[in-house]
């Protein structure tokens, strides 16, 4: 029975690898703005919302670019 699971894992592994790459690319493409939007919606106080709107998205964009550079090679 163990060999069946190993064989199934070998067949499924390339699909998971492709799906993981697609998820990573989508997250890097739309992630910073989406995460910043979620953070802004979850904060109730208006001054803090404005501060997050100005500061959070550029920081997340820089982090996403650094992550993309690491996996670009």
From Swiss-Prot:
It is found in: Cytoplasm; Cell inner membrane. The keyword Cytoplasm applies. The gene is pspD. This is Phage shock protein D. The phage shock protein (psp) operon (pspABCDE) may play a significant role in the competition for survival under nutrient- or energy-limited conditions. Keywords: Cell inner membrane, Cell membrane, Cytoplasm, Membrane, Stress response. It is a peripheral membrane protein. Induction: By heat, ethanol, osmotic shock and infection by filamentous bacteriophages. Belongs to the PspD family. GO terms for cellular component: cytoplasm; plasma membrane. Pfam families: Phageshock_PspD. GO terms for biological process: phage shock.
């Amino acid at each position: 029975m163990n060999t069946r699971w190993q064989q199934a894992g070998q067949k499924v592994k390339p699909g998971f690898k492709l799906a993981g790459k697609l998820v990573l690319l989508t997250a890097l493409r739309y992630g910073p703005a989406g995460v910043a939007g979620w953070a802004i919606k979850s904060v109730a106080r208006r001054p803090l919302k404005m501060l997050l709107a100005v500061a959070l998205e550029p920081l997340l964009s820089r982090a996403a670019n650094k992550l993309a550079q690491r996996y670009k090679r």
